[in-house]
Amino acid sequence: MQIIRNNSQDPISISNWRWACFLDETIKAFSTFQTRPYQIDNDFLFRESFFGSSSNPKKVILETWGLKMEKIRQARCACLQAGEITSVMNLVISPLNNYDLPFFGADFVTLPNGHLIALDLQPALKDDINHTQHVWNKLKPIHAHWQSKIPSGGDIPSDARQYFSPAFLWSRIPLGEEGDNLITQTIKPAFDEYLNCFFDLLRDAKITSKERSFQLLNGQKKYMRYRAEKDPARGMLRSFFGEVWTESYINNILFDLK
């Protein structure tokens, strides 16, 4: 029976979704604010498909959570579970462009060969110290503490570096007990501290000038275009849901700022 979700703030219903506690923490952080559902068409609130052999089909479910509020244009989370192993959380909190705030980004992916962890407060204007310095001063000590406890994820592609801060938490960790312990003891508290840092910045943010807002908007659009063009989940989503649906989801829901 297909789950019916009436709006983007309705609870995610994926059974045994690995990353549920991270989204729960995000929802809790927003609970002290007046929020509204972000407009997401029903076809993207819940999507179900099957993959594998006809004799042993496996279910894949994707649900999208989202909201908006003062200072936040869009907060949204793509939640996917495919079979028993593959599990994805792609969370982006996008500020309105008349506040000098970074994006909050968390990509947590479980695949048969391990977990990929990416966590950051991502700049819209990386080379602008007025946009970055107050963020990085708060975030760098948090990053240094937690990155030292997990393996590195490897080199960042050169064309992507402008979209990450120096406090980008990036790791590849194994499946099994070791990975489970790292997620519980390191990734979750690191996520909580990054999220708290973002919300501290959010509370303190003051409205900017029209000229500054225009600069921020251009930076945000550039970031969104890059994320849409380079989305690493594109191939997986196409295999599950087809090309047309996937391209609409990426360009009109996940990275929709034009």
UniProtKB/Swiss-Prot annotation:
InterPro entries assigned: Ferredoxin-dep_bilin_Rdtase (IPR009249), Phycoerythrobilin_Fdx_Rdtase (IPR022827)
Class of enzymatic activity (EC top level): oxidoreductase
Keyword Transmembrane helix belongs to the record: no
Keyword Iron-sulfur tagged: no
Superkingdom: Bacteria
One GO term (biological process): phytochromobilin biosynthetic process
EC annotation from Swiss-Prot or TrEMBL: 1.3.7.3
Catalytic activity: (3Z)-phycoerythrobilin + oxidized 2[4Fe-4S]-[ferredoxin] = 15,16-dihydrobiliverdin + reduced 2[4Fe-4S]-[ferredoxin] + 2 H(+)
Signal peptide: none
Keywords assigned by UniProt, alphabetized: Oxidoreductase
Family: Belongs to the HY2 family.
Function noted in UniProt: Catalyzes the two-electron reduction of the C2 and C3(1) diene system of 15,16-dihydrobiliverdin.
Protein name: Phycoerythrobilin:ferredoxin oxidoreductase
Species whose genome carries this gene: Prochlorococcus marinus (strain NATL2A)
Taxon lineage: Bacteria, Bacillati, Cyanobacteriota, Cyanophyceae, Synechococcales
Gene designation: pebB
